[in-house]
Design a protein with these regions (language model features):
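N-terminal Rossmann-like dinucleotide-binding module
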Residues: 2-70
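Glycine-rich, N-terminal phosphate-binding loop of Rossmann-like dinucleotide-binding domains
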Residues: 97-98, 178
Length: 429
């Protein structure tokens, strides 16, 4: 009889979207786990196979399959790539890495099919959509998780540890910035960039970092931005955004966080992105610069275009190990492995009759479960609405959270009647 230590279990994975994020994080994970399966004393050996992918044209899928490092997966392209993927194979989980305004439809289909879900941030763009995903996950007894890889950044882990252990006491305010190059808005994401903003795409990293690390209750959201480079100066496509969040804590005190994002940094910038955080506490200050971590490299005729001068070896680093193995490691890949381990533990981590207990234990992990994503999505929902008003000629809106009128209440200067964006309560009761 097989024991957990020798039994080989299997998870079949589906992938929706084969763009930049897939190449940087999912591809390295699936390649590595194909060579070295997951192992844990609770679930034994677990082989994870990329079984099927859905994409718009199928061209990238053909190239990856030809390379031979991901196995012989099935590839489905439009029309109805998603429907074909879910019908063709008996998948255990599906990863969704599409443009952010397409997350909901794909994620909903995955959960309706009874598959575990991992979706890129932001999970969805509205609280009503989040409610639906959470409902479907519970109804069908599967996990619904979100990729927040910055929580696994070793610097951010240390920040949270100092807060968790009470060494850094009561955050007062914070500033975060993440500036993407023009390559993102002008080339890599050009097919879906119209009508979008960099705040939803990248500020959400720091919304989650703030929400998860410091706790508290989100009470107000405001936002402004600039246009004219990616799209018309009077259009609805944004070059940069400045988001402000107000949180309130059990002490009755507030904290203010400003998050500045853009995707119009010159392509010859020394780092792939510019990113930093600063948080002030009652008894200290945390400064973290995620680009300038001490490594600079110049290579003639390579930097700063093909190779960047400042290298983030924590996120995603292709390396040759001292023992000769070529590998790709980093927190961007680790977060996907963590999800696969959670699924393996739910399905194979003990007796079948105790699966529901294991499922609830996995759902209680607030760093990535959709049930813990309410305040993050509330901020995204509010930001989207504020920027839409701004683009329509009504700047300066503020959204109050869990106000007397509703969960998300948008107020415009000079307009007496507020607009209720979401009637339910945002904060957990």
């Amino acid at each position: 009889m097989n024991t957990p230590a020798t039994q080989v279990n299997r998870l079949a994975a589906g992938m929706v979207g084969l763009g930049m994020i897939f190449d940087e994080t999912y591809r390295p994970f699936f390649e590595a786990v194909r060579q070295q399966p997951l192992y844990d004393p609770a679930f034994g050996i677990c082989q994870v196979d990329l079984a099927a992918v859905a994409s718009r044209t199928g061209r990238r899928a053909d190239a990856y399959r030809s390379a031979g490092k991901l196995g012989d997966f099935e590839s489905f392209k439009e029309p109805d790539a998603m429907g074909q993927l879910l019908k063709a194979r008996d998948l255990n989980f599906v990863c969704v890495a599409t443009p952010d305004d397409r997350h909901f439809a794909a994620s909903k289909a995955v959960l309706e099919a009874g598959k575990h879900l991992l979706v890129e941030k932001p999970s969805v763009l509205s609280l009503a959509e989040l409610d639906e995903l959470d409902r479907l996950a519970r109804q069908n007894d599967v996990l619904a998780k979100v990729v927040y890889h910055k929580l696994l950044d070793p610097d951010h882990k240390k920040l949270r540890t100092l807060v968790h252990d009470g060494q850094l006491q009561h955050v007062n305010n914070g500033y975060c910035t993440l500036l993407e190059p023009k390559l993102i808005s002008g080339e890599q994401f050009s097919e879906w960039i119209r009508g979008r903003n960099p705040g939803t795409y990248v500020a959400v990293h720091y919304i989650k970092l703030i929400d998860f690390t410091f706790g508290g209750r989100l009470v107000q959201v405001s936002c402004t931005g600039q246009r004219g480079i990616v799209g018309p100066a009077d259009g609805d496509t944004w070059d940069s955004t400045q988001l402000r969040l107000i949180y309130r804590y059990d002490s009755g005190r507030d904290a203010c966080f400003d998050i500045h994002t853009s995707w119009v940094t010159p392509n010859n910038f020394p780092g792939y992105v510019e990113q930093e955080v600063q948080f002030r506490f009652d008894n200290g200050v945390w400064n973290g610069h995620s680009r300038k971590r001490g490594v600079e490299c110049t290579i003639e005729d390579q930097t700063p275009f093909n190779v960047k001068i400042s290298i983030n070896n924590h996120y995603n680093a292709p390396v040759v190990e001292p023992w000769g193995e070529r590998a790709q490691r980093g927190y961007g890949i680790e977060v996907i492995e963590r999800f696969a381990r959670e699924v393996a533990h739910v399905e194979y981590g003990g007796p079948a009759e105790e699966r529901s207990k294991r499922l609830e234990a996995a759902r209680s992990l607030h760093y990535n479960d959709v049930s813990a994503d309410r305040q993050v999505v509330a901020a995204v929902h509010a930001m989207e609405a504020i920027l839409a008003k701004h683009a329509a000629g009504q700047p300066g809106a503020v959204v109050d959270v869990d106000a007397p009128e509703g969960g998300l209440v948008l107020r415009l200067p000079g307009v007496a009647e507020p607009e209720v964006l979401y009637s339910g309560r945002v904060a957990a009761k």
